[in-house]
């Protein structure tokens, strides 16, 4: 089955709000204002927030994660707080700042400022704008996890001359119906909270549902195999403290509109694998219920000789 892919768009306007990357800096953050032509909303003002780590003259790799990821991937001298990809970005690791320039960015809509449908194609075009601002003509590689893998697919299609290789981890060419239904129920939980004037509770519950999809029954069996307790006249099972904490942490850092619109964006994603013309490594996790191995195999088959598959085993579904 083939899916239509949006045609590339012309570069939109932008106005720098931060200093250019300095060759003497190990890490730099920036924030620019741009006008982006969006598939479902026309021209819209957006903010493009990024962080670069590594030598300014090194080959550039973009690293993008799931909808909860952001521009800060790993602690460094300039920005010592913990990042979301500490295991990947470090000396001697797969992405070593000593030999690569690693660029990460906040997805448009992640700040909650866009309350309209956001396509993965919009994210790819926003990245192209960012590369223009930074004076980066071409990426050595785009490494994408989950939602980032979907954005990477769109970037490889819409801006194919600007990337040499794509690595797509846990991201297929279309959402699986089971995963789409799961996300739809999560969004309904948020909507129910909004009706009760308690949208943070709805968002917390949606995140708690998500944790069940990120973890396997085997892990829960090992970690939470304790008898339930009766607390204030209610039965409370062993995993509830963990789920409550995960929900609270997510609510503290995530605007509700950001969650809703980026969740929808996953379900909007559709591409024709044959349209990806760069060498692509697809990484699947065995037992992943949201991005099944069969879907990743379908993506690789559609890529033809340009695609290869790696399968990982993990306790995290």
Regions found by a protein language model. Give the residues of each.
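Alpha/beta-hydrolase
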Residues: 23, 30, 187-278
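N-terminal cap/lid subdomain of alpha/beta-hydrolase-fold enzymes
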Residues: 51-110
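Conserved acidic catalytic loop of the alpha/beta-hydrolase fold
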Residues: 121-140
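Conserved hydrolase catalytic core segment
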Residues: 138-177
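Flexible "cap/lid" loop of the alpha/beta hydrolase fold
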Residues: 167-196
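Short beta-strand/loop motif that positions the catalytic acidic residue
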Residues: 276, 282-284, 288
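Conserved alpha/beta-hydrolase "acid-adjacent" motif
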Residues: 289-295
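Histidine-bearing beta->alpha loop at or near hydrolase active sites
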Residues: 306, 312-317
